[in-house]
Structures are given as C-alpha cells and as structure tokens.
Amino acid sequence: MSLLNSLLRLTRFWNLLIIGLAQYCTAGFLISTETIFDIRLFLLSSSTILIAAAGYIINDYYDVKIDLINKPERVIIGKGITRRYALLFHTLLSVTGVAIGFLLNWKIGVANFICAFLLWLYSNALKRLPFIGNLTVAVLTGLSIFIVNVLYPPMMVLVGIYSLFAFFITMVREIIKDLEDLRGDDTFGCKTLPIVWGIRRTKLFTYFLLALFALMITFLHQRSAPLPINFFAWSLFLPMVALVGWLVRADTRKDFYQLSQFCKVIMLAGILSMAFL
C-alpha cells in the first residue's frame, strides 16, 4: 500500500469531501451565491478539512488495539504508516488548520484551536466515556456548518437549523457506531452507552434524539420564523423515520454497520437539500 493511499484512507478522504461540500453549500445556498468564489471560504473550508483529517489520524493512533478487534482490515497505522509518522502528520495538519483560521479572523482561529484540542482529547479519553464522546463529535460536526455563518454574518435561522441537523444525525450515527463496535470497546474497558445501558435502552435514546430534533424544528417554525416545514418533512424528517424503522429491527454488527452508512447518506442528502431552498 502506497503512502498516499494510506494517508487518504487514514484521513477518510470521502468524509473530508463531504465536510467541504457542506460548507460550500451552506455559504452558496443559505447565505449568498457570491461567497462561492470568495478566497475566505476556500481558506475556511481548507482549515476545517485539515483539522478534521488530523482528528481522524489521532483517533486511529489511539485506537489501534481496539480496531484490530472491531475492524482489522481497516487498520492503517502500524501497517501503511508508522506510529511516528502518524503523529507527525497529525501535528502538521492541526497546526496548519489553526494557523489558517487565525489568518481569517481571531474568532475562527480560536474556534479551530478548540476543535483541534477537543479532537485530541476525544481520541485520548472522551470517546471511552458514555455519551460525552458522542456529544463532542456531534458538536464539532454542527460547528463545521455554523462557523460558515461566523465568517459571513449576520446569523441566519436556516444555517442554525442545518447545524442542528448535522448535530443530531451525527450524534445518532456515533451511538450506532458504538453499537457496531460493542465487542472491541468492551474488551478494552470503554464505557460507551451500549456497554453501560445495554442495546435496548441505547436504541430508545436514539429515538428520543431524533424526535427531539423534529420537535425543535417545529417549535422554531411556530415561535421564531416561518420555515419551509413541508420541505423539511420529506428532505430531513422522512429519512429519519426510515432510520428509526431500520434501527428497530437491527440486532447484528452488520445491521449496525449498514445503519451507520445510512446515516452518512442522510447527512449527504440533507446537505444537498440546501440547493432546493
């Protein structure tokens, strides 16, 4: 396996493309089409992608032993890339991403620094705690969309809604991934929700999260500003209903893996739905 191929797999290249797409769609469709060719948007997206890539690397660095049980075929560190080079790439990507943020403005620079630190802390400790690790990743994902509005104020309700969407669907996906990785996590003493609560209660919690998202959007529609609620019904809510129906029947590792991939499809569909608003 070549070094380049190993790096692309280690940094989840396709996930990084989705992050960039989300930020460009947010800027172009929810804020202003004039932002698409703005160099500041390119720099913001680049810094976000670099920090996310660094996060994937450090996560795999700390998870090598667990991954050898849960997904041995996907382990890169120690095979395609040495642990020393993995740490080097993580540091370079993190520092570059934070530096680009400060070039844009101090608020984005500080946000990027906090994100880079939280990704390291998540990989080192938080992901082994019930709920806290899931919450951290979900907040960072929602922030990757919201930060576009920090670059291009004033604050917009639709950007906030899609940030919430990214937050909740990521939270659910992270919990489903914990269900998928139950055996390896338990072996190494991780205290994820499925281990602490059991599969049934963990599933119930994911249903609650999805229902809470729908209730929050309905509340905003009634109390804040009129929203395209019918559009959201089929573009955001309907896929979530399908997710719940599938999750109810899921009970094998393969089922949870497929559900995790379906969450990525829902996320991508949600991002693309911005183009139709």
Regions found by a protein language model. Name each.
Residues 16, 58, 62-66, 184:
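Proline-centered turn/helix-capping motifs that create local helix->coil transitions or kinks
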Residues 2-10, 75-156, 161:
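Intramembrane alpha-helical segments
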Residues 18-26, 77, 135-152, 194-196, ...:
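Small-residue-rich segments of transmembrane alpha-helices in multi-pass membrane proteins
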Residues 30-34, 104-106, 126-127, 152-153, ...:
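Short helix-capping/hinge motifs at transmembrane helix termini and TM-loop junctions
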Residues 46-47, 64-112, 190-226:
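Multi-pass membrane catalytic core of lipid/isoprenoid biosynthesis enzymes
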Residues 22, 47, 93, 114-118, ...:
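Transmembrane alpha-helical core residues of multi-pass small-molecule transporters
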Residues 2-9, 14-17, 94, 124, ...:
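C-terminal membrane-associated helical module and adjoining short loops/tails
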Residues 20-62, 97-98, 102, 106-122, ...:
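Membrane-embedded alpha-helical segments that form the functional core of polytopic membrane enzymes
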